[in-house]
Amino acid sequence: MALSPKPMTVVRAEVEGKVNWLVVGHTGVIGHDRILISMSKSHYTNQGIKDSKRLSVNLVSREILPKADYVGSVSGATVNKSEVFAYHIGENGTPVIDASPLTMECEVVDIYETEGFDNFICAIVNTYAAPEVLDNNGKLDYTKLKPVLFEFPTYSYLATGEIIGKCLNLDKRPGMCAKEPMSADGIVRLSKIEVYPQYLDEYMKYATEVGEVSLRIE
């Protein structure tokens, strides 16, 4: 699966009146305020999420990785996992892992079923971050957060890497060579772009966040 690795998460849901924790490796971003949690239909936790429409999504650090690995290896149908993590109740009423560097309280807004999977579309209601993973401006610093990544094909845990460059500002060369006109309304966010003359008007119309536009003649 070429889109691995992804951040490893521990999802909490209430099932039959008790807290249950489950590792989820299939996650995604939908827009700026929605996330996707994709879970095999075989999981015990799915019905609890469908019933309550609430869950918490907890990122995993190296410190809590052993416990996360454990809750991902046993089923809540046969093992009571409610006390594996120390937790508190978030503002939206869902348990939040005390030691997680970052947790999102979510509400399920839609569910899409695909073969073998329940796919929960979730709105983020609250986000909690440990002070030690924030920069001086109160923003997330991923060099401090260092979430554990899960690589699905080999079932391996990876560490987050170093920063290798700043987006849209890698060097002085054009960020993109535009050979075709834009076919739909949208935003192109690039530090520089080269455009063939016949497409210049089209790109000037849509590319509102390009730092510098130049003509490509060869």
Segments (PLM) and residue ranges:
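Basic, polyanion-binding surface patches
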Residues: 1-218
